[in-house]
Regions:
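Surface-exposed extracellular loop regions of Gram-negative outer-membrane beta-barrel proteins
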Residues: 94-105
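Signature for the C-terminal beta-barrel architecture of outer-membrane proteins
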Residues: 19-40, 48-72, 82-85, 103, ...
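Phosphate/ribose-recognition catalytic cores of enzymes acting on nucleotide-derived substrates
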Residues: 76
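Positively charged n-region of N-terminal signal peptides that target proteins for export
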Residues: 1-5
Length: 247
């Protein structure tokens, strides 16, 4: 993937034209047991900023990790530009809208959960208003004994999502009103179709939420209402007998 290569060049290159500030940290994890549950993990985080431009890179070297797939190289990358009212992000994004009822993205390696988004994000913010737009792809890895190749440490199937979402938030003196829309086009794996073969089911999920928060001197109140619809996305059909089946 060429994107990470250009990200590294960008991080190094901005140091040639101005003052570059960098920080970093390293996490080392190692374990052994008599039942052969062994793991070795190394995580390296690099952060750089130059004026209004920020970048984050994470490298992982695991052989094997405690949970998840083996990785040796660049794992995450994000480049941001933060203006006075706007923010543009490209790369691996993690967002929380409201209290996380409709969108709550995190990377928790302790349980091998990563539901972040690889794509772009745009934010416009003033004192009274904030709007966010996100778009990109999301791969969620899971394990199940209903699919071939089950392993309690390594995921054996993947759910692919193509996401698009909008979040609007209006601030008032002692309250705020927000609206969120999130659409996911998912390729959901199923163990067996009508021909007893592994297959993928195309689904479209649409979520909408309306939330209100009130902050008073003696109490705080937060209410959110969410609706969700899911339907199958038929890309083509084949006539078969007296009916038809998805192709």
């Amino acid at each position: 993937m060429r994107f990470w290569f250009f990200g590294i060049l960008f991080t190094w290159g901005i140091g040639l034209f101005g003052q570059l500030s960098t920080t970093g940290d390293v996490q080392l994890r190692w374990g052994e047991s008599k039942n052969h549950f062994n793991y070795t993990e190394t995580l390296l985080n690099l952060n750089a900023n130059w004026g209004r431009t920020f970048s984050w890179l994470q490298f992982e070297f695991s052989d094997p990790p405690e949970l998840g797939k083996r990785i040796s190289g660049l794992r995450k990358i994000r480049i941001e530009y933060r203006g006075e009212r706007t923010q543009i992000e490209v790369g691996d994004l993690y967002k929380i809208w409201g209290r996380g009822l409709i969108l709550n993205q995190l990377d928790d390696q302790a349980i091998d959960l990563d539901n972040g988004l690889t794509g772009v994000g745009f934010t416009y913010q003033t004192k009274r208003f904030q709007g966010q737009i996100i778009a990109g792809n999301q791969d969620i890895y899971k394990s199940t004994n209903l699919v071939l190749g089950f392993n309690d440490r390594i995921p054996n199937y993947t759910m692919h999502h193509s996401l698009f979402g909008v979040d609007l938030l209006k601030h008032f003196p002692s309250s705020s009103l927000g609206y969120s829309f999130l659409q996911s086009r998912e390729r959901h794996p199923i163990p067996f179709n009508q021909y007893y073969q592994p297959d993928t089911l195309p689904l479209v999920h649409r979520l909408q939420s309306l939330r209100i928060e009130m902050i008073k001197s003696r109490f705080d109140t937060y209410l959110e209402y969410v609706t969700k619809t899911t339907h199958e996305s038929y890309q083509s059909v084949d006539f078969f007998g007296t009916g038809f089946t998805r192709k």
